[in-house]
């Protein structure tokens, strides 16, 4: 009996302690929930929101950077194309100007050549006309002198030589 009474007392002691521990644990949980759990969950939620915002901002920044890089690449390609067109147009313009200059130079050279030919022809005509006039004048002078006097063969030769010398001096 003694053993039974000790066991009964010890069971009630354990049950009382157990109830005390359970009540204390529940009170402790309520205090933790009220003072620690809510602020910790709020802090974790704020941190999760901040991380999500940072990820979204990073994604937007990356997309913006990709768009800007694509835009710069397109502008660079456009600039290269414009530069190639400018160079091509400059080459075409240079070739056109070169062809015009060559054509003008050829026309000018042809005109100068024709003018030189005309001048040479005119000079030849003038020389022929002058020679004809000189020969005619000389013939008239010779004929008039022959008529005025009859010459011997030596006198005739001397007269002709003097007129030829005069003609040569006259042309010089």
Swiss-Prot record:
Pfam families: ATP-synt_B. Its main location: membrane. The chain crosses the membrane at residues 12-32. One of its GO terms (molecular function) is proton-transporting ATP synthase activity, rotational mechanism. Coiled coil: none annotated. Keywords: ATP synthesis, Cell membrane, CF(0), Hydrogen ion transport, Ion transport, Membrane, Transmembrane, Transmembrane helix, Transport. Residues 63-131 are annotated as: Disordered. CDD domains: ATP-synt_Fo_b (cd06503). It is found in: Cell membrane. Residues 63-74, 116-131 have a biased composition (Basic and acidic residues). It is a single-pass membrane protein. GO terms for cellular component: plasma membrane; proton-transporting ATP synthase complex. F-type ATPases have 2 components, F(1) - the catalytic core - and F(0) - the membrane proton channel. F(1) has five subunits: alpha(3), beta(3), gamma(1), delta(1), epsilon(1). F(0) has three main subunits: a(1), b(2) and c(10-14). The alpha and beta chains form an alternating ring which encloses part of the gamma chain. F(1) is attached to F(0) by a central stalk formed by the gamma and epsilon chains, while a peripheral stalk is formed by the delta and b chains. Belongs to the ATPase B chain family. F(1)F(0) ATP synthase produces ATP from ADP in the presence of a proton or sodium gradient. F-type ATPases consist of two structural domains, F(1) containing the extramembraneous catalytic core and F(0) containing the membrane proton channel, linked together by a central stalk and a peripheral stalk. During catalysis, ATP synthesis in the catalytic domain of F(1) is coupled via a rotary mechanism of the central stalk subunits to proton translocation. Component of the F(0) channel, it forms part of the peripheral stalk, linking F(1) to F(0). This is ATP synthase subunit b.
């Amino acid at each position: 009996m003694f053993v039974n009474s000790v066991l009964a007392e010890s069971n009630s002691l354990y049950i009382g302690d157990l109830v005390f521990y359970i009540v204390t644990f529940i009170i402790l949980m309520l205090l933790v929930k009220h003072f620690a759990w809510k602020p910790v969950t709020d802090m974790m939620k704020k941190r999760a929101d901040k991380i999500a915002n940072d990820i979204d901002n990073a994604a937007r920044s990356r997309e913006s950077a990709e768009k800007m890089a694509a835009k710069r690449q397109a502008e660079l390609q456009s600039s290269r194309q414009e530069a190639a067109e400018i160079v091509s147009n400059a080459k075409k313009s240079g070739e056109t100007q070169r062809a015009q200059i060559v054509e003008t130079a050829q026309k000018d050279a042809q005109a100068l050549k024709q003018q030189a030919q005309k001048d040479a022809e005119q000079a030849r005509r003038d020389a022929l006309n002058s020679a004809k006039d000189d020969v005619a004048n000389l013939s008239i002078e010779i004929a008039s002198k022959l008529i005025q006097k009859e010459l011997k063969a030596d006198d005739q030769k001397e007269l002709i030589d003097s007129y030829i010398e005069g003609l040569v001096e006259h042309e010089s």
